[in-house]
Amino acid sequence: MTRQDIIDRLKDYFSHDDDIEMVLLYGSVAKGTFNPKSDIDIALYSKKELSFEVLAKIQTELAIMFDREIDVADLKKAEGTFLYQIMTNAVKIKFEENIYVRYAMKALYFYEDFLPILRRTQEEKLKRMLNG
């Protein structure tokens, strides 16, 4: 199954669900680096709360459809590096611009706040490596 096959089947699956406003494909399939054993990672945004039962139903149906493991994340609960990971390589399966922009900005603000800390940590590690 190709990357485009996965995208097309996800679009078809979610096209009939009006409660789910946005679906983002991320991870190795989104990047095009997947293999036959790779899982499929999707993040959902819903008008209604995504209960465990709803997420489990979607996960199970998609696992059967694709015959591979499916990871389903609730975008409302995604934060920090996880949200940044989703938003930086997302393929838009079902798209709502206002919602997308809100979460992209949230991820960007996190990255901008976290970047100085990350750089300082990397510099300290490099100094330790160079100094033995």
PLM features per residue range, with description:
Residues 43-45:
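Short hydrophobic/aromatic beta-strand micro-patches
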Residues 1-22, 30-32, 47-132:
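Catalytic core of pol beta-like nucleotidyltransferases
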Residues 35-38:
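Short glycine/proline-enriched turns and hinge-like loops at secondary-structure junctions
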